[in-house]
Amino acid sequence: AAQRQPERNKIIPRYMTPAAAGYASPALGDDYEDYEVAADSEADFAVRIAGDSMEPYIHDDSIVLVKRGATIFDGDVGLFFVDGDMKCKQYCQDYLGNVYLFSLNRARRDADVTIPASSGITICCFGKVLLKGKIPLPQD
């Protein structure tokens, strides 16, 4: 019987411009390099994180894997483009339609973003950050 070949890894783009974990950063562009991930990974692209507002779950200068077009639910971490800034944050929407983008590092709650439903501000989600397990929403 023929031996089954192990699946090869797949190549995704890793964008060179970091996504901010608390600070402004340009949107994803054409500046990327090939990045190898497991063949069964759901990731569509990778990006380096700059800043400490997502500690201890996502460290400064680490690379996160992102699934483009994934539905974002309360508690999920995503890459968001808000008012010209790219941010890696935890998502939450309340029953009134207000959106909250939380820093996981509560010492950096100053980097949280609140978008009132009535503001007219457009928020664009580039994708869901693929993490191991669910992260609880902040209680403060």
What residues fall within each predicted segment?
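Feature for secretory/organellar precursors and membrane-associated catalytic proteins
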Residues: 24, 37-116
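Short, positionally conserved secondary-structure boundary motifs
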Residues: 1-60, 93, 119-124, 130-140
